Amino acid sequence: MAPYQSFHIGLLGLALASVWPLSACAITPSFPPAVEQNQQVNGDRQEVQLAQNSDTYTFETFDPNSDEPKLNGKVEKGDVSASISYRQEKHDGYESWFPTVTVKFKNKIVATLEGSESPMPIALLQITDMDRDNPYPAVLFATYTGGAHCCNEVKVFTSNQNGSDWSVRDFGFFNGGPHPAEDLNNDGWDEYVEVDNRFLYLFSSYAGSAAPAQIWALQNGQVVDVSFEPSFQFIHRENAQSMEKDLPEIVAQDSEKNGFLAAYVANKALIGELDEGWQTMLKYYDRESDWGLTNCLEYDDQSNCLNEVKYDSYPDALRAFLVEAGYIEAKFEAENNTL
C-alpha cells in the first residue's frame, strides 16, 4: 500500500508531511521559495534537516555524522544566549539523561530549567524570532523523552518587553522527536508545526491513524494555535491533495479506515470543504468498528472516569470530537448522518 502523505513528525526530525501509516517514510510538500529542505530517509527513521534562515540559531545534541552525542552546546543572538548540558545517571544497567538549559540576557542568568529524563541525550536548543510583539527573541527547548511513539517535549523561554523577566511557556508533548521552529509562511516570524496528536489512537491504532497539521505561534508571550489562519492554507491544501490521491486505496481496506477518515474530514474543514469531506466519510467509514465510540469527558485525580459517553455511531463520535477540537462549529449538522 502506498504511504498516505500528510504531516508527520519523525523520531529525530521534522517531516512536513504525515504518512499512512504513521511509521512509514514521508515526503515533504513545497514551501514558499525562501525555505530550502534536504530530506534523508533510512528505513523507518527519517530526518529532515530544514535549511536555517539567517535569523535562526539552533544547536542539536544529536549528530548524524557521529557515534557520540554533543552533550554541551550554546546558541547566541544579540543580547540573548542559551546553553545546554547533560548529566547521566545509571541504575540497574539502565542509563538516564537529564538536560539542563540556562538562558542569559545581557550575560545575566535569567532562567534555568532541568528537562525531563530521557533514555538518550537527544535535544534541540534554538533562539528564534517567534513573537512579533516582543523585541527580543525566544529560546525554544525541545527534548526527546522516550516512550512508544513518544515524545517531543517542547518549551519556550520568553521575556517581557524590556527583557528583565523571563518565563517558560509549554507547547506540550508530541509524537516523534525534537525539531526547530520555522518561518512557514515567510512573514519573518517562526512557527512550530506538528501533527494534531489528538487524532492518534482515537479511531484507529497508531499505525492506522492520520492527523492534520497543527501550527503553533507565540503571540504576546502566549502559545496560540494558528492552524486556521489563511497564510497556512497552502499546507492544508497540499495535505488534502495527497489524501485525495490515496483515498481510493485506503477505503478499499477491510479495516483501519476510520482513523484516516477523521483526519480527512478535519483537513477538509481546514480548507473550507467540510460538507464534501463529511459526505465522503459517510460513504466509506467502517460501520463494524467500535474504536472511539466510547469517550471519557472527565477524570478524577486517580485517572478514574467520572463521566463516560457512548456514541451510537462513528459519525456521531467524529462530530463530537471535531467540535470539541475546534475544527467544526457546534451548529454543524450534516445533511445526512448515514448513507
From Swiss-Prot:
A cellular-component GO term for this protein: plasma membrane-derived thylakoid lumen
Compartments, record wording: Cellular thylakoid lumen
Domain of life assignment: Bacteria
Signal peptide interval: 1-26
Organism, as annotated: Synechocystis sp. (strain ATCC 27184 / PCC 6803 / Kazusa)
Name of the protein: Probable thylakoid lumen protein sll0997
Keywords in alphabetical order: Signal, Thylakoid
